[in-house]
A protein has these predicted regions:
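C-terminal edge-of-domain segments
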Residues: 2-3, 118-166
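Short, basic/aromatic recognition patches
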Residues: 3-23
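A short, Trp-centered hydrophobic/proline-enriched beta-strand micro-motif
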Residues: 16-31, 71-75
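A positional/architectural concept
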Residues: 33-40
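Short active-site oxyanion
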Residues: 48-52
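Short His-Asn-centered micro-motif
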Residues: 54-56, 76
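Short beta-strands and strand-coil junctions in structured, solvent-facing domains, enriched
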Residues: 60-61, 132
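Short, structured beta-strand-loop surface elements
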Residues: 64-127
Length: 166
């Protein structure tokens, strides 16, 4: 595990790791206590400790979150060997100014009436915990790690891994 990071360092590290990931998996708890995950389109906004997603006001996830607001959001970038798991508290936000700030025309696939769509709402996740893995991603790194492990009997550099409270 890596060295302890300050709050600002942890937020900056996570922001860098999730910046280009276009789809995240949002996991909520159903009324039966089961975990339910679904893909969510990420928004082009700098991570500052909060995550934002557009959602339909009457989608099943909204009901689940109103009942049990603790959620997990997972980001995966296998090409770069980066993985992030964020936990926090979700809430539904109705804010037309924030909608306008975060809106992207590609979202019309889900909200045909655009910013005027009556179903349009924001889901805000206030992140309070994170765990991430940032491994060397090049083929050369993997070969060097393999050779190092064979020669020394010790595993190669697993990269950066940390659990942080935000």
């Amino acid at each position: 595990m890596s060295e302890t990071k300050t709050h600002d360092e942890a937020v900056a590290k996570i922001a860098t790791m999730i910046k280009d990931t276009r789809i995240a998996m949002l996991t909520s708890v159903t009324e039966n206590g089961d975990l339910h995950s679904r893909p969510m389109a990420t928004l082009d906004v700098e991570f500052d400790g909060d995550l934002w997603f557009f959602t339909g006001k009457h989608s099943p996830k909204v009901h689940q979150i109103e009942e049990k607001p603790r959620v997990n959001v997972a980001f995966s970038d296998p090409e770069n060997q980066t993985y992030v798991s964020l936990s926090g508290t979700a809430s539904l936000v109705s804010d037309s100014a924030k909608n306008k700030e975060l809106w992207n025309p590609a979202l019309q696939a889900w909200f045909p009436q655009g910013l005027d769509d009556p179903e349009l709402s924001l889901l805000k996740i206030h992140v309070d915990g994170a765990e991430y893995w940032d491994a060397p991603s090049s083929a050369v790194s993997h070969v060097v790690g393999f050779v190092q492990a064979k020669l020394t009997g010790k595993s190669g550099d697993p990269g950066d891994h940390a659990k942080v409270e935000l």
